[in-house]
């Protein structure tokens, strides 16, 4: 196995384990993988308690699992679209370089 492949695998392992080690022992109240939405709403209420939202969502998912599923589905669709365009451009470049 080439050195660049070994270094890439080591880098992936470090990037996978580092967040888990850095946040081990923290709970969600301490900011363990907390969301930006919750932090933003807390800050808004702290700065301006009389603030009222402009609108309410027309539909809320029935559970947190459904919300996570929809988020993962959105991420997967985005990854497919981005991957398609990278593959299309790579194939186009390869085709043009052969001709």
UniProtKB/Swiss-Prot annotation:
Compartments where found: Cell membrane
GO molecular function terms attached to this record: cobalt ion transmembrane transporter activity
Residue spans crossing the bilayer: 6-26, 68-88
Biological pathway: Cofactor biosynthesis; adenosylcobalamin biosynthesis
A GO BP annotation: cobalamin biosynthetic process
InterPro entries attached to this UniProt entry: CbiN
Cellular component GO terms, alphabetical: plasma membrane
Top-level taxonomic group: Archaea
Membrane topology per record: Multi-pass membrane protein
Keywords carried by this UniProt record: Cell membrane, Cobalamin biosynthesis, Cobalt, Cobalt transport, Ion transport, Membrane, Transmembrane, Transmembrane helix, Transport
Subunit structure: Forms an energy-coupling factor (ECF) transporter complex composed of an ATP-binding protein (A component, CbiO), a transmembrane protein (T component, CbiQ) and 2 possible substrate-capture proteins (S components, CbiM and CbiN) of unknown stoichimetry.
Function: Part of the energy-coupling factor (ECF) transporter complex CbiMNOQ involved in cobalt import.
Sequence similarity: Belongs to the CbiN family.
Protein name (Swiss-Prot/TrEMBL): Cobalt transport protein CbiN
Protein's gene: cbiN
